[in-house]
């Protein structure tokens, strides 16, 4: 709902978002649109690209973004780099939403599962900042 959208934009000023490869392409446009509307800054990144080019997936997400919101977007294909960048530019009292991986502790690239954990990356990055 609009109320939930407004509340989310007040809380999650910065987001890291990705869409999976080999999935519904139409949802990528919606994800790009929603994430850009609900953030002051959003980084589009990879999230299990599987056999697709991660840059093409991000391009699909960008295609769903209104022109007025395009200045909010940064695309960083490398998910670790995206999380580190978002952590470094976050301001005190910002809440950073890193969406997509959830409980998964891997990235699927081509047919390989590569160890990857958003929480570990965030923890390491924040420890280095102290």
Enumerate the predicted regions with their spans.
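ATP-dependent carboxylate-amine ligase
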Residues: 9-130
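Positively charged, low-complexity/disordered segments
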Residues: 1-10
């Amino acid at each position: 709902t609009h109320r939930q959208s407004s509340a989310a934009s007040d809380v999650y000023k910065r987001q890291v978002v990705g869409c999976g490869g080999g999935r519904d392409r139409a949802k990528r446009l919606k994800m790009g649109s929603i994430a850009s509307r609900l953030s002051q800054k959003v980084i589009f990144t990879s999230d299990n690209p599987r056999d697709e080019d991660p840059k093409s997936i991000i391009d699909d997400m960008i295609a769903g973004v209104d022109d007025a919101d395009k200045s909010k977007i940064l695309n960083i294909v490398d998910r670790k780099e995206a999380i580190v960048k978002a952590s470094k530019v976050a301001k005190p009292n910002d809440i950073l939403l890193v969406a997509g991986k959830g409980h998964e502790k891997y990235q699927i690239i081509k047919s390989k599962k590569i160890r990857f954990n958003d929480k570990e990356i965030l923890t390491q990055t924040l420890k280095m900042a102290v």
